[in-house]
């Protein structure tokens, strides 16, 4: 699984660099999954990658001391994920729940991820 947490403005360049390195069946996990990820990573999806996106970030943090520490303001009580193709979403529910230790719900399609 390849996890991307960069701003949406970096997606196009990231997709270009990633394209020669990926294989069918690999997973690209975008957090958050909005920002046009489905368009930026279209060629990777066409190569058979699974796009997994989370509606929102799992927690919020703020800078405490520059270059030294941050603090967490809070965590979501529940996460929502979607995939392209849509029928792949169920296999990621447990993975995301274990990764973040937060209850995770699956969405019927990726459009639900983008319209948040």
Model-derived segments and spans:
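N-terminal Rossmann-like NAD(P) cofactor-binding module of classical short-chain dehydrogenase/reductase
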Residues: 2-3
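Rossmann-like NAD(P)(H) cofactor-binding subdomain of soluble oxidoreductases
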Residues: 8-65
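Internal alpha-helical scaffold of NAD(P)-dependent oxidoreductase catalytic cores
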Residues: 65-116
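Structural motif
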Residues: 7, 33, 82-86
């Amino acid at each position: 699984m390849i996890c991307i947490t960069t701003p949406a403005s970096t997606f196009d360049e990231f997709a270009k660099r990633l394209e020669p390195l990926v294989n069918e069946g690999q997973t690209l996990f975008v957090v958050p999954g909005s920002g046009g990820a489905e368009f930026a990573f279209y060629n990777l999806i066409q190569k058979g990658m699974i796009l997994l996106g989370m509606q929102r970030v799992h927690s919020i943090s703020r800078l405490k001391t520059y270059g030294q520490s941050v603090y967490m303001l809070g965590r979501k009580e529940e996460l929502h994920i979607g995939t392209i193709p849509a029928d792949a979403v169920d296999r990621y529910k447990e993975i995301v729940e274990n990764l973040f230790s937060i209850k995770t719900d699956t969405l019927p399609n990726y459009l639900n991820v983008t319209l948040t």
